[in-house]
A protein has these predicted regions:
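Nucleotide-activated donor-dependent transferases that construct or modify glycoconjugates
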Residues: 2-18, 44-45
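Structural motif
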Residues: 5, 96-97, 116, 170
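Short amphipathic alpha-helix
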Residues: 21-32
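Active-site donor-binding segments of glycosyltransferases and PAPS-dependent sulfotransferases
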Residues: 34-107
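Active-site proximal beta-strand in glycosyltransferases
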Residues: 97-99, 111-143
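A short beta-strand/loop micro-motif in the catalytic core of glycosyltransferases
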Residues: 99, 167-175
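Helix N-cap/beta->alpha junction signal
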Residues: 102-103, 121-123, 175-176
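Membrane-proximal helix-turn-helix segments that form the acceptor-binding/catalytic region
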Residues: 137-170
Length: 176
């Protein structure tokens, strides 16, 4: 049986994020709502629930402290060093099932031992893994002298990415 109390975690809900990951989130949300299991939603930031006409209009979305930072909603990716810590601050207590939809940090949401965590991973954090060198070669910031700092941050992100994957009960990937 499908649990009554379900939470959904995604990296962010912003007007500019309308890719494949967001379409999957919408489809899973519609499926759960259709089964009379409207999930509690959580994200680093939410710029959608207050927008008229948005599929999230009127929904209560739990967010991280990034929501309150300057340009947190519009430029959430600029806070990359803080995102792993920020996703861990979102409290999903009370949910029996947590479904995360991850292309960056959502799978890192903390769950209790009595919660089942299912994570659908769209892609690895490619700019931290297999595309790191290409990413750094295109980054003006990396070429301006911050390269060593950015490399260290991407190294830390890879370590956290591996650790957070170990905390998930079931990991699903949409590719190899």
């Amino acid at each position: 049986d499908l649990p009554q109390r379900i939470a959904r975690a995604h990296a962010w809900f912003t007007p500019r994020s309308t890719g494949g990951a967001e379409l999957v989130v919408q489809a899973i949300d519609a499926l759960l709502c259709g089964l009379d299991r409207t999930p509690q939603l959580a994200a680093l930031v939410d710029g959608e629930s207050s927008r008229s006409g948005s599929w999230l209009s009127g929904r209560n979305i739990r967010t991280s402290p990034i929501q309150q930072l300057p340009w947190g909603i519009s430029h959430v990716q600029q806070y990359l060093p803080l995102l792993p810590l920020a996703i861990e601050q979102i409290d999903l207590g009370g949910a029996e099932l947590v479904i995360s939809s991850s292309h960056l940090v959502a799978k890192g949401v903390l769950t209790a031992p009595d919660q089942l965590h299912l994570s659908y991973v769209h892609t690895p954090v490619r700019y931290a893994w297999d595309q790191m060198h290409a990413y750094l070669s295109r980054s003006a910031l990396a070429r301006s002298g911050f390269g060593p700092l950015i490399r260290w941050q991407l190294h830390a992100l890879r370590q956290w990415d591996q650790l957070s994957a170990q905390r998930v009960d079931h990991l699903l990937a949409n590719s190899r």
